[in-house]
């Protein structure tokens, strides 16, 4: 894989946007879910300690996040969602310019704070192929990583800091290594080392933009051999 081909300004933006997956549990089974909620189901929830560490490190390092998403799975299924929001509020006070947002298919079970954008009425029926391993279809791994990195930024989950929002499912499907455990060690180099491991399994690597590229040639329910074997293994142990 070639080096990250973004300008210094674009690299800065990538490293200052993040989605926090607070749960892997979902009450939908959308086909080709990039979080793996259809074929690689999991009920794992992030701990409050993990959220507290994220906030403490961000403040200690004076890390100026531009955007923080509270995601899943389905975030409203986390039984401590209100406590998570209370912890994140400390960072909101530290950096009021940071844009917090969340997306849900449910009704928020409490009065939602105005400092978090609550995205409702999302079309959950639209998905395209995801479970297509580039190595299965002889797609060359000779370009920079896909648009997801600079559109969505990093991911933070119970696995640590990860290079993109699709990373969690790769870890549990293929039993890959965890992410970076401390924010002070998050940089372009550490994220690209993880991309070398994760991207070879990801169908979105074959996208040029959100709706263009080689991946769009496959039906939305298509699953390549590497993913089928991973799914069979996963179902045997869960």
Stretches found by the model and what they are:
Residues 1-15, 126-128, 167-186:
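Short, charged low-complexity linear segments at domain edges
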Residues 1-104, 109, 220-238:
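Conserved alpha-helical substructure of the radical SAM core
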Residues 31, 78, 122-125, 162:
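General alpha-helical segment detector with a strong preference for membrane-spanning helices
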Residues 52, 121-129:
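A short acidic, often aromatic-flanked loop/helix-cap motif at beta-alpha or helix-coil junctions
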Residues 79-82, 111-112, 165-166, 211:
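A short acidic (Asp/Glu
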Residues 104-105, 120-121, 166:
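Histidine-centered beta-alpha loop that forms part of the nucleotide-sugar donor binding/catalytic region
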Residues 113-123:
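Non-cysteine beta-strand/loop elements that form the S-adenosyl-L-methionine
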Residues 133-238:
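Accessory C-terminal segments flanking Radical SAM cores
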């Amino acid at each position: 894989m070639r080096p990250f081909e973004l300008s210094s300004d674009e690299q800065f933006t990538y490293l200052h946007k993040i989605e926090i997956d607070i749960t892997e549990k979902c009450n939908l089974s959308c086909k080709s879910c990039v979080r793996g909620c259809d074929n690689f189901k999991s009920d794992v929830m992030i701990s409050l300690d993990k959220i507290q560490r994220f906030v403490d490190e961000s403040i200690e390092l004076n890390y100026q996040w531009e955007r923080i998403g509270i995601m899943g799975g389905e975030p409203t299924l986390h039984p401590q969602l209100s406590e998570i929001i209370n912890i994140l509020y400390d960072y909101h006070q530290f950096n009021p310019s940071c844009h917090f947002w969340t997306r849900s298919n449910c009704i928020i079970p409490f009065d939602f704070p105005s400092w978090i954008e609550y995205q409702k009425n999302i079309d959950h029926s639209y998905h395209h192929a995801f479970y297509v391993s580039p190595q299965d279809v002889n797609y060359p791994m000779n370009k920079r990583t896909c648009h997801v990195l600079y559109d969505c930024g990093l991911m933070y989950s119970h696995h640590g800091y990860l290079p993109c929002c699709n990373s969690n499912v790769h870890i549990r499907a293929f039993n890959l290594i965890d992410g970076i455990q401390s924010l002070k060690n998050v940089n372009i180099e550490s994220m690209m080392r993880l991309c070398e491991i994760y991207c070879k399994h990801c169908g979105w690597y074959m996208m040029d933009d959100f709706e263009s590229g080689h991946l769009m040639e496959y039906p939305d329910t298509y699953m390549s051999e590497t993913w089928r074997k991973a799914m069979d293994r996963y179902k045997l142990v869960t």
